[in-house]
C-alpha cells in the first residue's frame, strides 16, 4: 500500500533537449525539451519512483516500481491519484464505460456535472448503453475561469489499463481505474497485473 507513510529517500533532477521527426504532421521536427525530477519513495523495505517531466506547455508524471529484490511481480488493485480542479471549471468530455462504442459528441459542463444522466439529457441518450460509474474518457479539456485551457490525457500505457476521470464533488476528479469499473487485466481479477519492474523511463 503506497497511499500513506511514504518517506523520501532521494531526489534527483536533470534536463533534456532533443528533436524528433514525426511521420505525419505540419512540423518537420518537434522539439523535445523538458526538466525531469525523480523522487525515490520508500515504505518499509519497498521502493517506488515518482517521475515528473516539466515542459514549456505541460507537465507529465508517472509512477514506477524499480527493480528490487523484494518484488518479482505485483498486482495493482486501485489507483488513488487525483486532479484537484475548481468547481468553476468547465470541461468538454465524453462518457466512459459505454459498451457499444467509444466516440461521442462532446458535452460541455462543469466538472461536477459529469454523469450519464447529464449526457443523456443534454447530448445523446446513453441510458441503454452504459455500465459502471459516472466518468469521462480522456482527452479531457478544461476551460478555466481565468480563460486558460488545460487538457488531461494519458500516454505510455505499458502493462497498465487506460484512464478515466470520475467526479467526486467540489472539483476533485480522481484518475481511474476504480475497482470493478474496469475490465480486469490480471488473471486473478485485479485491475492491472504488471509482469515486473520495467525501468524508470
Give, region by region, the residue ranges found by the protein language model.
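N-terminal accessory beta-strand-rich subdomains and adjacent acidic, glycine-rich linkers
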Residues: 1-201
Amino acid at each position: 500500500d503506497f497511499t500513506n507513510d511514504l518517506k523520501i529517500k532521494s531526489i534527483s533532477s536533470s534536463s533534456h533537449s532533443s528533436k524528433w521527426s514525426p511521420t505525419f504532421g505540419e512540423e518537420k521536427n518537434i522539439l523535445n525539451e523538458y526538466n525531469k525530477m525523480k523522487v525515490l519513495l520508500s515504505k518499509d523495505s519497498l521502493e517506488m519512483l515518482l517521475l515528473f517531466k516539466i515542459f514549456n506547455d505541460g507537465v507529465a508524471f508517472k509512477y514506477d516500481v524499480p527493480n528490487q529484490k523484494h518484488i518479482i511481480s505485483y498486482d495493482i488493485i486501485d489507483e488513488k491519484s487525483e486532479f484537484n480542479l475548481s468547481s468553476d471549471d468547465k470541461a468538454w468530455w465524453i462518457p466512459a464505460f459505454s459498451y457499444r462504442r467509444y466516440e461521442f459528441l462532446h458535452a460541455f459542463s462543469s466538472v461536477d456535472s459529469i454523469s450519464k444522466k447529464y449526457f443523456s439529457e443534454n447530448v445523446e441518450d446513453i441510458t441503454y448503453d452504459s455500465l459502471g460509474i459516472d466518468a469521462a474518457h480522456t482527452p479531457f479539456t478544461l476551460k478555466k475561469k481565468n480563460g486558460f485551457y488545460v487538457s488531461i490525457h494519458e500516454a505510455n500505457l505499458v502493462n497498465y489499463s487506460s484512464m478515466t476521470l470520475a467526479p467526486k464533488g467540489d472539483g476533485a476528479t480522481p484518475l481511474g481505474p476504480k475497482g470493478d469499473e474496469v475490465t480486469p487485466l490480471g488473471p486473478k481479477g485485479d485491475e492491472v497485473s504488471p509482469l515486473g519492474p520495467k525501468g524508470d523511463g
